[in-house]
Every structure is written in structure tokens, then in C-alpha cells.
Amino acid sequence: EDRMKSLEILKTFAASYKKPLFLAGDMNAEPESDFIKELQKEFRILSNPKQHTFPAPAPKETIDYVAAFKQNDKGFAVVSSEVVNEPVASDHRPIVVELRTAEKADKIFRTKPYLQNPVGNGMTVMWETTVPAYCWVEYGTDTTQLKRARTIVDGQVVCNNKLHKIRLDDLQPGQKYYYRVCSQEMLLYQAYKKVFGNTARSAFSEFTLPVTGTDSFTAVVFNDLHQHTHTFRALCRQIQDIDYDFVVFNGDCVDDPASHDQATAFISELTEGVHGDCIPTFFMRGNHEIRNAYSIGLRDHFDYVGDKTYGSFNWGDTRIVMLDCGEDKTDDHWVYYDLNDFTQLRNEQVGFLKKELAVKEFKKAKKRILLHHIPLYGNDGKNLCAELWTKLLEKAPFDICLNAHTHKYAYHPKGELGNHYPVIIGGGYKVEGATVMILEKKKEELRVRVLNAKGETLLRSE
């Protein structure tokens, strides 16, 4: 009788709380007792009553429990519950219930969304969350009538992860689209039970795919930032008044990635710095993206054109070809420990180039731009791609080639070094030698401006 009265006091006390409230301890009552049945009207038992807790040496009864007040039990999930095999520490065996509490909605996003792979009448939206989540993108030509896109692989929605990649397909070139990313925390993902937490929705961002056959665009190219935030921000100040359509990071920007956290931090720095939620970015590999423990995982943060680290695409009537030079030393160099085979990658791109130079998209393009990190011309060291690629490229009618790697700005007009097209090499990560390239296509003209971190013009090609 006294126990039942104490239960009423407990219920009254619990009702005054607005947050999850837990009750744990020796109830001195078995699961079938009137007391436990009455308790369960207001409390949800989280421990497993089928696992006995008393007496500790050889348990035969369940009289210890962990329970949650039902009125406020929505902000968590039970991950596991067990009675610990500890027969001597007490006359009761300990109970352990592992809970996962819900994150606040305003803490769910780790990064802002950033746009990738704006080809084939589509756009990829990527972002990260602080917790495993079920995610989707809401998008449309206005913010009142929205479609929903998710990533579905082999019939299953990709979820319960933190790095998110969702493709928006069948978009209209030249049409402005609005979108926002949505992430609902997944507290529990089991075979027959899912528990969801709060939902976060980003602010609306917008983007526009290029009009098919457009003859004008502006692009910005960075290189060799080597995770130097100060240098990057100084260069961004020089382009803040430029209305650019896409951005290329031409290698050694997210260098030597040691961990997911390190990569995420600087990728966010880069994408936010160039308004990557509205402007698509292309991340190309330099030799330093290939190094360190997280180098293989780095590709998960991007959506490469054709799912390769090299490729080609059209921006209007201009063809852009991107190559991956791999490392700057031979595969048998001791520092690689026989874990590299860039010879295969370079040979693979020979086949790619032969096909690329023969397709109508390349042949009929009004202008053709080549990008790769390590220069074939003007490089202090040996370019391991030269023997494979030079003869193919010297026959191709490229209008400009943009390179990096040497950490020293240089411009080599056509023919100066035996090059069959003009070559521009970007500067390095030190503020005094850093550069940013502005690529401008207007009707029949293709121009490149190179600025330093002070805003001084180093080159204005015609």
C-alpha cells in the first residue's frame, strides 16, 4: 500500500519536468506485480525484464529496472540494454542501458550545402551533418512548389550516414532553381525498428545551369593553396565583385588529408569562400591530395564528372578537359611503399584523350580549355605524363592550358617552350606569390586574367 502511494508521488513529481526523466534502481517488485503494471502506465521500461538481476551470484528474479517517463520520452532511443555479469560487487547485478539522445535541430548541419558536377542537365548537392541522418533535397523553380530528391541505390534510400550526396536530374538549362537541404537525425537504425530525431532545414539557395550553347561565361581557378586560409581569403577578396559561373580548384588545395575532420574543415572553407551553395565547384587532384591517411577517402567529398578524377564537359559552346597527373615521382619510389600505381592511371587517360579528341563535343566546340595540375611545359622537374600525353595534346587545338604545382606564376605563349597552346601556371600558397585566375569567355573571345593577392594584374591575355 505504501509503495503504491509513493508511486503517485513519483508521477506527480515527474509531470513537472519538460525534459526526458529516467527512473533507475531496485523496485523490489517483479515484472508481473501490480506495482510494475501500474508503473508502466506512466513509465516505459527500458531495461530487459527477462534478464534477472537478483541475487547477484545466481539471479532468479528481476527486481531492478531502468525506466523513462512516457510524457517526455521522444528525444532518445535505446541502443542496447544488458545485465552486467558481476556476481560479487553487490547483492544485485548492475543494469546498463545505452541511450542516444536527439541533437537539437540547429546543431544537425556540420557544413553548408555545396554544388558539384553541373553537367548532363543535372546538379549534385553535397553537405555533412554532425549526426547520422535521413536526408533529402527540396527544390523547384520557386519556393512554394517543391519537388523532393533522395539518393536511392538498388532500391534503398541511402541514409543513417553523415556525408550526403543527392543528385537533381532532368533540370532545364538556363532556368533558375531554388533548393534547400533537409536532414532528419536517425537515432536508431535496426532491422525492424527506426527511431528519428529532429529535422533541420537549410535556408534556400539558388543556382542556374548554363543555357545550352551559351557563348559567354566566367570561371575562377585556384591552385596550390595547401590549406592556407589566409592566402585563400586574400585571393577571394580580389574576386568578390566578379560574377563567376563556376570555380575550379586545380590541385594541392586540400593537401595531405590526414582525417575526415581535416578534409571537411578546409573543403568547407573553400566552398563557403566562393559561395559554393550557389556556384558549382570542381575539385581536381594535385600530387598532394594523393598523400596521407585520408587521401583515398577524399573522393567521397566530391562528385566527379563521370565518377573519375579526370574528365571533360561542356559549358555552353566551350569544351573543358581535365586530366589527373597523379604523383610527381615514379611508382617505385620508396616513399610510396608500393601502394601507388599511377602508371595505370596515366595510361588509362591516354585512351580517354584519344576518345575525347574524336568526339563531336570537342571537335565542334568554339573554344577548348585544358586543365591539369603538373605542367607539361615550364615544370622544373620531370612530368611523368609527358611521354604518354604530349604527342596527343600537341595535335589538339586547345586555346589555353591552365597548370599549377611549381608554386611560381608563369606565362608561356604558344611556341615558347615547344608548347602548341598558351600555358599559364598559377602561383603558390605564400601570400606574396599566390594567384587566382579569371577565365572569361565572351562570344568569340577567350581571355584569362591572373591576379595576385594584392589585386594586381599579372596577366591579361587576349
What is the role of each PLM region?
Residues 72, 90-93, 98-221, 240-242, ...:
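Acidic, histidine-bearing metal-coordination/catalytic regions of metal-dependent phosphoesterases
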Residues 1-106, 187-190, 212, 353:
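Active-site regions of metal-assisted phosphoester/phosphodiester hydrolases
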Residues 1, 216-226, 317-327, 369-373, ...:
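Active-site-proximal beta-strand elements of phosphoester/diester hydrolases
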Residues 36-68, 164, 380-444:
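Conserved beta-sheet core of the metallophosphoesterase superfamily
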Residues 27-34, 53-61, 227-233, 255-259, ...:
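Active-site environment of divalent metal-dependent phosphoester hydrolases
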Residues 215-293:
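Conserved, compact domain cores that house catalytic/ligand-binding motifs in diverse enzymes
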Residues 182-206, 261-358, 388-397, 410-429, ...:
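Extended active-site neighborhood of metal-dependent phosphoesterases/phosphodiesterases
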Residues 2-40, 133-135, 242-246, 273-280, ...:
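His/acidic metal-ligating clusters that form di-metal
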